[in-house]
């Protein structure tokens, strides 16, 4: 059974993991935010606004973004970006732990990007305040039951142009949205960390 207690126990060993910026790299962080409403554990997602120059334009993502020179750690990036994008002060909640960093290599990125995903928990009353604040970056905020992400009934495919041709990618559908790509890969890291397999795999 997927529960907050399971997530806490699985990620507790990651809390003290050395989480710093490596030299000569471009960094970004995302926040996988959990809340519990009516006994159901839910996850926060955003749909990015359609924006020229954004490699993930219009895609479903976690709140987060790139590090600035003033950011002291990956967690600081995730917390600042979440506050700016959707108005949630997740630093007032519980930082459960970190997922493995990912190095993202894309032709449309000037430099490789090191992504740090961090898992948080906030109370439901605070979660209700989530709303797009930066409309030029975030089009929509929504919550998905964690169990939904592990249900094979919602596995789908999405067509996306890459390398001059349309390719099919696995995803998870929810109320007209499709969670796929980098966000799905982060979810896979989460599933591996908690020891529960996901039916949708990249």
Regions found by a protein language model. Give the residues of each.
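Short, contiguous, pocket-lining structural segments
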Residues: 23, 178-182
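Buried hydrophobic packing segments
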Residues: 33, 183-190
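Entry/capping segment at the start of metal-dependent catalytic domains
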Residues: 1-24
């Amino acid at each position: 059974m997927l529960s907050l207690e399971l997530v806490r126990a699985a990620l507790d060993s990651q809390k003290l993991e050395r989480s710093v910026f490596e030299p000569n790299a471009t960094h970004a962080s995302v926040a996988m935010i959990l809340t519990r409403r009516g006994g159901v554990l839910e996850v926060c997602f955003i749909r990015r606004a359609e924006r020229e120059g954004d490699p993930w334009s219009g895609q479903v993502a976690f709140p987060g973004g790139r590090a600035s020179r003033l950011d002291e750690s990956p967690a600081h990036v995730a917390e600042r970006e979440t506050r700016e994008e959707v108005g949630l002060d997740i630093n007032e909640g519980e930082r459960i732990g970190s997922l493995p960093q990912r190095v993202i290599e894309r032709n449309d990125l000037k430099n490789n990007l090191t992504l740090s995903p961090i898992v948080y928990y906030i109370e439901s009353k605070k979660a209700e305040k989530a709303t797009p604040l930066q409309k030029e970056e975030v089009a929509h905020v929504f919550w998905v039951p964690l169990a939904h992400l592990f249900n094979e009934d919602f596995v789908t495919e999405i067509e996306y142009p890459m390398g001059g041709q349309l390719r099919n990618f696995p995803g998870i559908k929810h109320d007209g949205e499709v969670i796929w790509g980098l966000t799905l890969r982060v979810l896979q890291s989460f599933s591996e960390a908690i020891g529960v397999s996901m039916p949708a795999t990249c």
